Amino acid sequence: MPTLSQGQPDNSGPEPHLHRQTAESFGVNAERYDRARPPYPQALVDRIVAASPGPHVLDVGAGTGIEARQFRAAGCTVLGVEPDERMAAFARRSGVEVEVARFEDWQPYGRRFDAVISGTAWHWVDPVAGAAKAAQVLRPGGRLAPFHHVPQLPAETIDSLTEALQRVAPDSPFNPSLLKAAAVEAYQPLFAKIADGIRQTGSFSEPEQWRFAWERIYSREEWLDQLPTFGGLTQLPADKMAEVLDSAGAAIDKLGGHVTVPYTSVVITSTRSHTDK
């Protein structure tokens, strides 16, 4: 299990946690988000559960409850924290307990947890303040484990998205052309920032990176259903979104009406020290 480089992270790119409007825009269609976004590999869930000292889990950026339901099915009790009331309301309807707040501002009121998780949402959290809050609420030996889906999109789909966005929304923060590189490597600056934030607290073991490879075949309809849930696309007006979907649909048609997307789900993880440095 590799540890993460302690070299200086690449700070040249934007800081996602500062883009609050985008971070809190996913609830515009919470039902679509929950339907279209893929769950996490069962092996990822099982490993985090096995590596945690108990079953009490805090889910940061719980969204509609996708990963919370998976951890509940694995025997955990899960409390979600979610800044978007619309997403939280959907999660509650699926049986997930959720409190509405930005994690950095959330009040734990003395509650402690065995694991703090975050499913493709930790990049919306300040990496230092978030790690410090996690240290506050984790029991000694508890596990901090934010994880992210990293899709390796086919070049044809990237090209169609890039062209469409340059035409209809040149200022969009979503830049699919960056994904032409090996996807996991393209995400390393983000993962390095997460790890550096954990280190800065002085409250955790050296961060590790766990990787889980899998793939999913999307039909044309499934892929076009998921695209509007991507950050940076959630705020497009309907007419511009229609243009993006037309372009994306044409690309899928050229691929035979479906697209196979390899994923690597990456966990950045560390355990809460028994004493702070």
Residue ranges, per PLM feature:
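Conserved Class I S-adenosyl-L-methionine
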Residues: T3, V184-K277
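Conserved catalytic/acceptor-binding region of the Class I
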Residues: R139-A213
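Conserved class I S-adenosyl-L-methionine
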Residues: P2-S52, G54-G61
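A short acidic, Gly/Pro-enriched loop at the edge of an enzyme's catalytic core
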Residues: W106-V116
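A short SAM/SAH-binding and catalytic strip from SAM-dependent methyltransferases
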Residues: D114-V128
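Class I SAM-dependent methyltransferase SAM/SAH-binding core
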Residues: T64-W106
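A short glycine-rich, Lys/Arg-flanked "PGG" loop and its adjoining helix->strand segment in the class I
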Residues: A129-P140
